[in-house]
Structure formats: structure tokens, C-alpha cells
């Protein structure tokens, strides 16, 4: 008989097959260009087509992707970036990497995503962006958040790392 403390709920399960192993082995044996080889361009093109975007840039992590986005927009000291109160640490770390300040906003109870109704009270003259995060494949009310960012001339940077494959009103997230 198992005790409750012996029960484990898996956070994820990795599925691979022989083709996956062969492709990875081929890349490793090539000995160079692991991160910039032709497979990366093929992957970026596939993602662009899948989500319906004009651009795709592969980085090593979601943290790096957020950090690069914040740098590209020129966020820095004294700027405020609204983030969900329930998020992965990358959202806050990337904000701090550019010396901006994270401003935590409430989440929706049904998606655990950023609650659009809580954003307005968090906006100040220092606010530069809103960063909703898709959690566990569920997207927040992104259309309402987009409207708020447009009305307040703020950047909308979607952290859709956990939402790849999800869609809202027929449009892929991210």
C-alpha cells in the first residue's frame, strides 16, 4: 500500500522516438554550429508558419527572449513593467536585468493569466509595458489586455512560452 507522500504527480513527461535521437546525435556529432546550424533556420520557419508571424528568432530560453525584448524596446532604470502576480521567475528576472521595476498585477481565476481588469490601477507615468504570461497552455484575456496597452501607448510583450499551440479566437498566441 502506498502512502500519500509516495504519490507523485508528474510535471511533464518527455516523449522521444528513434528519429529524435538520430537527429540530435547527428547535430552533436557535427561538432560545431549546434546553436546556429541549418536546423535552427528550419525550426524558426516552421514556428513562423505555425503561429502566423512574420518573424521568429530562436534564443536559448524564455528568460533570454524576454530580456532581449526589453533591451530592444530600450526599457531601463525607473521604468515599470506590469507582470502577473503568478508567473515564472523569468518574467521578473528579465525586468530586473534591464534595471526596470516589475509591478505585480492580479490574475484570472480560470486561466491563472494576467487579469485585464486589474491592469488599469497599476499604470503610472513610468509604465512602459505589460507582460501577460500564458500558463499551462491557457491564454488570458489577451484581447482586453491588448486594448488597454493600445489605449495607454504601452508595449505588449506576450510570454507565450507555455502557450505554444494555444489559440484565442482562431489566432495562435504569442
Residue ranges and their predicted role:
Residues 166-174:
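Active-site "gating" loop of Rossmann-like NAD(P)-dependent oxidoreductase/epimerase domains
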Residues 10-13, 60, 131-133:
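Short beta-strand segments
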Residues 71-163, 167:
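PLP-dependent aminotransferase-like
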Residues 19, 42, 64, 89-90, ...:
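Short alpha-helical
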Residues 13-16, 32-35, 104, 111, ...:
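Pocket-edge positions in alpha/beta enzyme catalytic cores
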Residues 32-80, 94-98, 104-106, 171:
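Phosphate-binding glycine-rich loop
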Residues 1-33:
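N-terminal "arm"/small-domain region of PLP-dependent enzymes with the aminotransferase-like
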Amino acid at each position: 500500500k502506498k502512502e500519500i507522500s509516495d504519490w507523485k504527480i508528474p510535471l511533464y513527461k518527455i516523449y522521444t522516438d528513434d528519429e529524435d535521437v538520430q537527429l540530435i546525435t547527428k547535430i552533436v556529432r557535427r561538432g560545431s554550429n549546434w546553436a546556429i546550424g541549418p536546423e535552427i533556420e528550419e525550426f524558426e520557419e516552421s514556428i513562423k508558419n505555425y503561429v502566423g508571424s512574420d518573424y521568429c528568432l530562436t534564443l536559448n530560453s524564455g528568460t533570454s527572449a524576454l530580456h532581449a525584448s526589453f533591451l530592444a524596446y530600450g526599457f531601463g532604470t525607473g521604468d515599470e513593467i506590469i507582470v502577473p502576480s503568478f508567473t515564472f521567475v523569468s518574467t521578473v528576472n528579465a525586468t530586473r536585468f534591464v534595471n526596470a521595476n516589475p509591478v505585480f498585477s492580479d490574475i484570472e481565476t480560470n486561466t491563472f493569466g494576467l487579469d485585464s481588469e486589474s491592469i488599469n490601477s497599476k499604470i503610472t507615468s513610468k509604465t512602459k509595458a505589460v507582460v501577460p504570461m500564458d500558463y499551462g497552455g491557457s491564454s488570458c484575456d489577451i484581447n482586453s489586455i491588448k486594448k488597454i496597452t493600445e489605449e495607454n501607448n504601452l508595449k505588449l510583450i506576450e510570454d507565450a512560452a507555455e502557450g505554444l499551440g494555444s489559440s484565442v479566437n482562431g489566432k495562435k498566441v504569442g
